[in-house]
Amino acid sequence: VARIAGEHIDNITLHHYAQADEDASRDDQYWLAVTAPSRIGDLIAMSRATIDAHAPGGKRIPISFDEWNVIHRHAKYPRVIANGDWSALEHQALFTTLGEQMGVAHQDYALVDGLYAALFFNVLLRNADHVTMANQAQLVNLFGLIETGPAGAYGTAEYHAFRLYVEQSGPTAVAVRVDSPTFEVRATGNLPARQGEPYLDVAATQDIERRKLWLHVVNRHPREEIAVRIDVGAGITEAVHHLLGGRGPWTRNSFTDPEAIAVSSTHLDWVGAGPLTFPACSASSLELTLAEP
C-alpha cells in the first residue's frame, strides 16, 4: 500500500484487540491484558519499518491506531456471526440485545483493564514520532469508557486511565531508560508467549516552559509493590503522585460503588533522594517540578 499509493495517503491504520480464550483463567486474562500493549509496540515497530522502507521518496506516512482494546470473553458470551445483509448498526444492535438477555452485555472494565489502557498510552508516547492519532471504541455502554443507567453514570477503569493521562502529562514525549525485574508469560488467546517483560513500564512527558516532568509508571506485578530510584538529571523542588489504583486487579466501579477505582493525588516529601514505591497493579503519573539550572 505504501509503495503503490503512498503519495496519496495521509495515514495508515492499525487495529488490535487482545482477547483471551473463552475458558482462560483469571491469571491468564490478567497477564494477557498487561502484556498486550507490548505486542502492540512490536506491531507498531514492524509497521514503521515497512512503511518507511516502501513510502515514495522517503515520505513519512504516520500511523493512526484507531481501534484497540482488550476483550474478556466468557464462554457464555453471545457469538454473533457477521451477515452481509446486516448493516454495522444492525449487527451491533443484535449483539447488544443478545448480551442483555444473557446479562453480559457490558464488559465493565476492571482495574487491570485500566492498566492495559495506561500501558497502551505509554506505547503511544514511545512512538509519538510515528503514531499521530489513536481512537477508542466505544465511549458509552456496551464496551464503553462510561456506563450509564437509570441510577446514574460512572467512569470505568479505562475512563480513569484516560483521565490520568489527559490531566497529568506534558505536551512533549521524552525518552527514558528503565532497569526493572522481568517476567515471562505463556501464549494466551491471540497473543504469543513473551519473555523478558519488565514489571515496570515507564514513559515520560515534559512541559519545558513550566519546568514540569511527568513519569508515567505502570507496575504490572499483581501483588507486589516495587521500590525504584529515579534520576532525572536535575534537582526536584516538588513531587506529586497521581495514582490510578483499587483493591485488586478485578475491582470494578459500579452504580453502588462508583469510586472503587479512582485517581488520587498526593504531595510527596520525596524530592529525588532515596527510593520511591509504586503499588502493585497500579498506574501512576509522577509530576515533578524541576529546579532552575
Please give the residue ranges for each predicted region.
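Generic recognition of flexible, low-complexity loop/linker segments
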Residues: 1, 50-54, 120-123, 133, ...
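Noncatalytic carbohydrate-binding groove/subsite architecture in carbohydrate-active enzymes
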Residues: 1-121, 127, 180-195
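Conserved, mostly hydrophobic/aromatic
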Residues: 12, 47, 67, 134, ...
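Flexible loop/turn segments at secondary-structure boundaries
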Residues: 18-23, 69-75, 140-146, 184-185, ...
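Catalytic cores of secreted or luminal carbohydrate-active enzymes
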Residues: 121-138, 143-194, 285
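Carbohydrate-binding surface patches
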Residues: 195-235, 241, 284-287
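Acidic, Ser/Thr/Pro-rich beta/coil linker or hinge segments at domain junctions
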Residues: 235-278
